[in-house]
């Protein structure tokens, strides 16, 4: 089972992810907590230095930080070299003009998802909790498959056109065939990713807070994911001020702390109602987490 937690920065994704992972580990399930957030705040929450390979936290819980940027750069460098090889004999072709096109958004996110997929297929863990970077990075990751597929198909079409040019001779033909094969394999894995994200074995959860910015970001993200066919399972609203009751609220006039708390409690009520309506309209589950 994969739990993918996402939401805007500062809403408590890492705290929720760590709590989720610890819960399953305490239930006796072998659990892996993975963070793709560049800030790597998981280290701070768990108070353990976490590296790029699974680090043992408890008997049933491992954790790791992932940074797929280096792997993505290495792969794209290979792509660039092969494109230069294919196009080098074309009159007027600038071998460096393709460099920027090769570094399109989403490749590092693709390799991050590749790592998650590999751990899921290995069956070393029953539960994987994926603490993602803020929403923008996550959306780029979720849309990366289509962007990468489009990019790969452009390269393959380019190869076909070049092969049809009269008198054109490929350099490093055997290497070119290998890179084309690798591109085609990536297309196949992209299809697997999309099926995986929509499967019952994945729970994509939006973490939010009861504020205007928090609600708007959550609603936009939900709408976007629905548009690309990625189902959201639940919305987790964090930092809720609980109802402390009449005895506490009665001290508002004489206790500044009570007054501030009651003010925040009152401000949050309308947003909690909006979240409630949002999950009802979209048949989702709503989970509320209080600040105390």
Label each PLM-derived region with a short phrase.
Residues 193-292:
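C-terminal lobe/tail of nucleotide-utilizing enzymes
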Residues 1-11, 15-187, 191:
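Nucleotide-state-sensitive switch-loop elements of NTP-binding domains
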């Amino acid at each position: 089972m994969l739990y993918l937690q996402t939401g805007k920065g500062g809403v408590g994704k890492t705290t929720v992810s760590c709590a989720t992972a610890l819960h399953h580990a305490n239930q006796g399930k072998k659990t892996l907590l993975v963070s793709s957030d560049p800030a790597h705040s998981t280290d701070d929450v768990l108070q353990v230095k976490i590296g790029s390979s699974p680090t043992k936290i408890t008997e049933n819980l491992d954790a790791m930080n992932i940074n797929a940027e280096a792997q993505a750069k290495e792969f794209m460098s290979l792509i660039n070299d092969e494109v230069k090889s294919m196009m080098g004999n074309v009159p007027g072709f600038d071998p460096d003009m393709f460099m920027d096109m090769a570094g399109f958004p989403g490749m590092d996110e693709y390799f991050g998802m590749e790592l998650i997929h590999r751990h899921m297929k290995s069956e070393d863990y029953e539960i994987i909790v994926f603490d993602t970077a803020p929403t923008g990075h996550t959306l780029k990751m979720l849309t990366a498959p289509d962007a990468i597929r489009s990019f790969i198909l452009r390269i393959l079409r380019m190869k076909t056109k070049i092969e049809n040019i009269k008198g054109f001779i490929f350099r490093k033909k055997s290497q070119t065939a290998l890179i084309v094969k690798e591109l085609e394999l990536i297309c196949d894995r992209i299809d697997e990713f999309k099926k995986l994200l929509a499967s019952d074995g994945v729970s994509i959860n939006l973490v939010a807070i009861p504020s205007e910015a928090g609600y708007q970001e959550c609603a936009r993200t939900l709408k976007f994911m629905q548009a690309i066919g990625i189902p959201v399972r639940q919305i987790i609203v964090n930092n809720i001020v609980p109802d402390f009751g009449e005895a506490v609220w009665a001290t508002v006039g004489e206790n500044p702390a009570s007054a501030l708390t009651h003010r925040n409690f009152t401000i949050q009520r309308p947003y909690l109602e909006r979240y409630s309506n949002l999950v009802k309209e979209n048949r989702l589950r709503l989970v509320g987490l209080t600040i105390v």
